[in-house]
């Protein structure tokens, strides 16, 4: 979910994964910004990361960064980076995801948006 806090000029993204991870990420933003950034770190009082004990012991989340971009051609792009510390190798690993979404059809009852 995306949330907008107009009074504080902040945009927030909430993400929950069924395996036991919850992320509340956010940053400052203005109403017409076309690039939105979302950051979260474990242990922060706001914009933090929680995970269950099982995952924490095997793949500890160290950082989360994500960017949403509203492109001029009407597409929507995103990129996410979840930094993990793997217990098995003691190494850090970036779990990344990015994509560009294209609108297939407008679903709005008003004709000017059809």
Question: What would you call each of these model-derived segments?
Answer:
Residues 1-113:
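Soluble ligand-binding/transfer domains with enclosed cavities or grooves
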């Amino acid at each position: 979910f995306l949330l907008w806090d107009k009074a504080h000029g902040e945009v927030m993204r909430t993400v929950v994964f069924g395996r036991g991870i919850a992320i509340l990420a956010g940053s400052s933003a203005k109403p017409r910004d076309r690039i939105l950034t979302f950051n979260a770190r474990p242990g922060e009082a706001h914009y933090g990361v929680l995970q269950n004990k099982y995952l924490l012991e095997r793949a500890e989340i160290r950082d989360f960064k994500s960017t949403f971009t509203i492109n001029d051609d009407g597409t929507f792009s995103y990129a996410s980076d979840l930094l993990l510390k793997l217990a098995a190798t003691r190494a850090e690993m970036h779990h990344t995801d990015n994509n560009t979404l294209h609108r297939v059809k407008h679903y709005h009852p008003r004709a000017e948006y059809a």
